[in-house]
């Protein structure tokens, strides 16, 4: 009986080990494929086709790499570019990623930060003129997320100070004191919008990004 039990346990252990090996092998394969896709396809596309000669990034790029030069440029897109190349540099150490991260940080702070009312502009023209000055919690969180990542990647104090400043603005203007949580959208000077773009005063999506941004900033 003891021998049968031992053989059974040995069989189970061998099966677990085999599954672990296969799992680790699959994980390694998937990881390698993802890294290759990011470094060989995703990041190069944006590096080759999205960088505008004026120092910013095109608001729209077609699938074949053709930029729509007169397309408006969004705060969320540019915050994502900032986060992406900052995270890429922090992960891979490639100096070309650092160059784009720093370029993105400068453009974002100079173009999308509302120096008067606080917060992040939603849309600007290619020449930097504000097209839509509405404030969205969604855009605020991506800005904090991107700037915090840039600080982690470079140690740039301006990025950290700007991220912390946006955090305080969002807590002061965007947080709903009576029921808690964060209101979705506001006017340029932080009055609540009566007509919400998504017909909701608060959304799960915005709150997920608040959690994401605040966690990284912390």
Placement of each model-derived feature along the sequence:
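Glycan-recognition and catalytic cores of secretory/periplasmic carbohydrate-active enzymes
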Residues: 21-218
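Bacterial Sec-dependent N-terminal signal peptides
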Residues: 1-25
